[in-house]
């Protein structure tokens, strides 16, 4: 008896429509071989979302989408992020290296089903868990990095359970499951070469992949490797933002807080010059208010130094083997390793948030008294200083599967590790202050030395440093260092389950699955010694983290084929975290009913439980965000320091889905599902903007320069909390129609998701209707109401082509008002509307091997993404676009040659 995994008939329709794609030139041969395989192997069939075997005509009671390798190729996907970004059910994923909202995770990618968070979707590889990345997002969420999962050439298909699956898979499957399944029993060799070129800057991408497999009488070995090299795209190559959106009040030249008798501390623009050195004067009082001086700030354009696309190199390897023994036991093992390196652009130096004092005796001080410096060590005229990430992932998984007279069993072990290092340069607080006092330099002893004498030098923060009094590299090096965060995430999973028939019903045998699982997740984050002492002026620092979490689980599933038309699925899972978190029991009920041969109904309801992670309870981090200061009435680039919270409670949720499938005639299908997720005690990072809005003069939460009540905001202190609730609902619609004509086969497809509700209860912002909003001022994510993909595919013999039109609806930006001004105290005429966005992709491929009758297969593919080079809708914020929704790259053209031996 053989064991295999396949997609259901319903999911097969979704496979093409989900990505608005259909078959390429060589798809018919794949179709034929799949049909033959189905005829041979029908005894045991599994689909993602179930642990019991299914009959050949089974239709999943849960909404299940399957994207096969043909569909993946048809959109020109170079990596997994290219696939998930086109999914209409994916909202708010972090797949762009945006330094302002994704500070330390450049080079990674993730999935965010339904906008419920990148940690709420369980990502599997061949039905087994993968380790989460050791470096969390800005929101403190550790996620599975899909960039490190497996070479694209090894993927056979991606299966998505869209209604939540915690009752079967555990707490991480709150929003659903995405299961990447590799090719099995591959025999042969394949090499692919990809080249992609962007319309802006020097943004290019080269990918080389190889696949090899060999089969014997009882087993198979397969190996895959991929290498990716991507050049960067800087904001200066394609400026989408307005100048003021990427301008900081802390520049160099900078400003100085001077105590004015009877007035208090006022910011004074560098008297030696601002605009002359590339700065932008921002006057806060009319010229002449203070004779000879200008009240205000010297703005600095930091945006041009940052990158939309990081410079990246990736190596990903995967090896699998399976062997079938004579006693119907099959052994499988797989090993994967990934090495990712990324470098994203950064400003010459960060703002200095500690208000250091320039003494009255400083040789360049024109004020005659001590003043507080409000700026940065290096600004205009200097090169950018990038941040670097290094991510190394290792995964080993092995299992034994056995077949019995009435079912099968499986035992498995998985071990996966992610080592992640993030490095970013910053200024040291004490050393910078010493340099302003004249004790700068690594050889200077501030106890025995004299200011500005011998090895002791002054650092000159004034604009005379650009001309008559430049700074030496010796003094600059003495107060600059790199913050190094070395993190490690470790996952171990032991699992065993069995599935067997229990009794016969009208539609076949009822089947029962029972299983147990033990998993342990360890996380350690080692900050460098300087960070442990909070030595940096902007990124500050944090203590080290070292913690673990282990979970015992037992689960069961009962499949009841009541009759030929009615199937019922009952599932329940018990998980015990121990300690303060405790345990949970989460059930699921799912039903499918075939009313007629053409029309079927389905529905499901389930509960979920997500425990606080090690990082959320014990961790902490400092991130960089652009915030709107209601006191100053201006935007500011601010350090947000978040501390862990050991008092967090687990979050709980209930999800339900109802839908139907309608096939009025052959090759035409309509799928519609209504879904709803409702959370209580949602674990979130406090929204920094909401903290600032609710307590702008709270000195414990809001740190300001100069006057602690009215000075410019420098730092926000927040934590992780349990929000009151979140409820989101919507409709998924999929349709596909295959037409056979004399000119070839044409297949139009439509896939859409409409969000009807995204209601939030924010601890600071209160109740929010978040559907159709950016949700900048609350805990939510950007939620355009409608995403839609429209496609048309054509195939004729050795030729194939497809065109996709992708639409994202407009939505409100609650950070800005309709007139483009910042939302300080409310917008009388409503929020600024982010325009809807339409892009067109196209692809053509030809089977050169068939054309020239060669023994090998040579498939040439050419295509374009965003063919008309549409700019992403403008957003009045850092970088000028919404990195959670839109792609900043513009038109991308690509070519691929695939050779199979």
Regions from the PLM with identified roles:
Residues 40, 150, 185-188, 201, ...:
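Short loop/turn motifs that connect adjacent beta-strands in outer-membrane beta-barrel proteins
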Residues 567, 675-815:
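Gram-negative outer-membrane beta-barrel transporters
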Residues 80-83, 111-112, 141, 145-148, ...:
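N-terminal periplasmic accessory domains that precede
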Residues 429-431, 756-757, 805-819, 846-901:
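C-terminal beta-signal and adjacent terminal beta-strands/loops
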Residues 138, 233, 237-246, 276-312, ...:
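Surface-exposed, low-complexity loop segments enriched in small/polar and acidic residues
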Residues 2-88, 209, 213, 327, ...:
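N-terminal Sec signal peptide and the immediately downstream disordered periplasmic leader
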Residues 85-129:
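Extracytoplasmic beta-strand/coil segments of soluble accessory domains associated
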Residues 128-162:
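Short acidic/polar hinge/loop motifs at secondary-structure boundaries
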């Amino acid at each position: 008896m053989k064991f295999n995994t396949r997609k259901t008939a319903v999911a097969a329709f979704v496979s093409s429509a989900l990505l608005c794609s259909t078959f390429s030139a060589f798809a018919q041969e794949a179709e034929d071989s799949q049909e033959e395989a189905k005829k041979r192997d029908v005894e045991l069939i599994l689909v993602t979302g179930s642990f019991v075997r299914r009959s050949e005509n089974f239709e999943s009671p849960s909404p299940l989408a399957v994207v096969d390798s043909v569909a993946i190729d048809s959109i020109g996907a170079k990596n997994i992020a290219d696939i998930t970004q086109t999914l209409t059910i994916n909202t708010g994923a972090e797949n762009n290296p945006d330094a302002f909202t994704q500070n330390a995770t450049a080079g990674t990618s993730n999935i965010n089903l339904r906008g419920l968070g990148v940690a709420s979707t369980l990502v599997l590889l061949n039905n087994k868990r993968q380790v989460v990345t050791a470096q969390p997002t800005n929101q403190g969420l550790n996620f599975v990095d899909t960039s490190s999962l497996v070479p694209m050439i090894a993927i056979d298909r991606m299966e998505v359970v869209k209604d939540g699956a915690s009752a079967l898979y555990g707490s991480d499957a709150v929003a659903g499951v995405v299961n990447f399944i590799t090719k099995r029993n591959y025999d042969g060799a394949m090499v692919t070469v990809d080249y992609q070129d962007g319309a802006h800057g020097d943004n290019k991408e080269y990918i080389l992949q190889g696949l090899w497999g060999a089969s014997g009488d009882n087993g198979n070995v397969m190996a895959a490797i991929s290498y990716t090299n991507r050049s960067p795209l800087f904001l200066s190559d394609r400026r989408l933002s307005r100048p003021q959106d990427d301008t900081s009040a802390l520049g160099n030249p900078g400003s100085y807080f001077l105590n004015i008798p009877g007035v208090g501390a006022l910011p004074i623009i560098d008297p030696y010059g601002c605009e002359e050195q590339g700065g932008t004067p921002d006057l806060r009082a009319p010229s002449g208010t203070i004779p000879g001086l200008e009240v205000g700030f010297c703005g600095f354009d930091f945006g041009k130094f940052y990158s939309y696309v990081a410079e990246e190199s990736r190596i990903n390897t995967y090896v699998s083997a399976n062997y079938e023994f004579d006693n119907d036991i099959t052994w499988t093992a797989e090993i994967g390793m990934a090495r990712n390196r990324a470098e994203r652009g950064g400003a010459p130096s960060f703002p200095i948030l500690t208000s250091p004092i320039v003494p009255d005796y400083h040789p360049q001080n024109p004020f005659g008294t001590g003043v507080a410096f409000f700026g940065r060590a290096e600004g205009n005229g200097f090169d950018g200083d990038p941040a670097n990430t290094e991510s190394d992932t290792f995964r080993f998984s092995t299992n034994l599967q056995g077949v019995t007279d009435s079912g099968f069993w499986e035992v498995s072990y998985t071990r996966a590790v992610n080592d992640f290092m993030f490095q970013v340069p910053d200024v040291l607080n004490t050393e910078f202050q010493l340099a302003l006092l004249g004790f700068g330099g690594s050889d200077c002893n501030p106890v025995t030395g004299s200011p500005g004498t011998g090895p002791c030098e002054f650092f000159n923060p004034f604009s005379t440093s650009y001309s008559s009094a430049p700074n030496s590299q010796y003094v600059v090096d003495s107060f600059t260092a790199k913050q190094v965060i070395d993190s490690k995430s470790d996952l171990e999973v032991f699992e065993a389950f069995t599935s067997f028939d229990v009794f016969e019903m009208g539609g076949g045998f009822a089947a029962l699955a029972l299983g147990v699982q033990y998993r342990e997740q360890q996380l350690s984050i080692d900050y460098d010694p300087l960070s442990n002492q909070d030595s940096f002026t902007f990124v500050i620092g944090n203590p080290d983290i070292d913690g673990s979490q282990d979970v015992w689980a037992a689960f069961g599933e009962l499949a009841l084929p009541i009759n030929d038309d009615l199937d019922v699925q009952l599932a329940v899972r018990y998980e015990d975290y121990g300690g303060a978190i405790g345990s949970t029991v989460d059930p699921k009920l799912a039903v499918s009913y075939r009313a007629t041969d053409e029309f079927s109904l389905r529905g499901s309801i389930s509960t979920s439980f997500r425990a606080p992670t090690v990082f959320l309870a014990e961790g902490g981090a400092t991130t960089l965000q652009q915030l709107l200061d209601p006191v100053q009435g201006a935007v500011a680039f601010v350090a947000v320091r978040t501390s862990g919270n050991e008092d967090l409670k687990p979050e709980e949720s209930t999800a339900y889905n109802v839908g139907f499938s309608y096939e009025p005639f052959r090759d035409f299908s309509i799928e519609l599902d209504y879904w709803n997720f409702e959370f209580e005690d949602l674990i979130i990072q406090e929204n920094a903007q909401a903290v600032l809005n609710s307590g702008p003069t709270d000195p414990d939460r809001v740190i300001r320069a100069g006057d602690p009540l009215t000075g410019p905001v420098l730092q926000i202190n927040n934590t992780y909390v349990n929000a009151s609730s979140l409820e989101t609902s919507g409709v998924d619609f999929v349709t596909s129609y295959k037409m056979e004509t004399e000119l070839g086969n044409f297949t139009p497809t439509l896939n859409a998701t409409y969000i009807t509700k995204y209601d939030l209860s924010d601890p600071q912002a209160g109740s929010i209707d978040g559907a159709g909003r950016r949700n900048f001022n609350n805990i939510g994510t950007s939620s355009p109401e409608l995403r839609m993909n429209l496609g048309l595919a054509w195939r004729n013999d050795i030729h194939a082509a497809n065109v996709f039109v992708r639409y994202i609806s407009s939505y409100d930006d609650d950070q800005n008002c309709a007139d483009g001004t910042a939302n300080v105290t409310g917008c009388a005429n409503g929020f600024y509307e982010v325009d809807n966005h339409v892009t067109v992709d196209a692809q053509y491929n030809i089977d050169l091997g068939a054309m020239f009758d060669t023994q090998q297969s040579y498939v040439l593919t050419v295509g374009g993404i965003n063919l008309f080079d549409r700019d992403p809708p403008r957003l009045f914020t850092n970088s000028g676009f919404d990195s959670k929704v839109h792609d900043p790259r513009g038109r991308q053209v690509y070519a691929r040659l695939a050779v199979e031996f």
